[in-house]
Structures are given as structure tokens and as C-alpha cells.
């Protein structure tokens, strides 16, 4: 999954923080 913003729901919606 990809988030709209890496600083928005990244740590709660998907793994785009890595």
C-alpha cells in the first residue's frame, strides 16, 4: 500500500515510512 503523504497516515495506514 502507498500513502498520500509519508508524514500523514504512513505509520498507521501502510509501510511507506521505511
Swiss-Prot record:
Disulphide linkage map: 3-17
Keywords, ordered alphabetically: Disulfide bond, Knottin, Neurotoxin, Secreted, Toxin
Tissue: Expressed by the venom gland.
GO terms of molecular function: toxin activity
GO CC annotation terms, alphabetical: extracellular region
Location relative to the cell: Secreted
Domain notes: The presence of a 'disulfide through disulfide knot' structurally defines this protein as a knottin.
Function: Neurotoxin.
Family membership: Belongs to the neurotoxin 03 (Tx2) family. 06 subfamily.
Protein name as it appears in the record: U11-ctenitoxin-Co1a
Species for this entry: Ctenus ornatus (Brazilian spider)
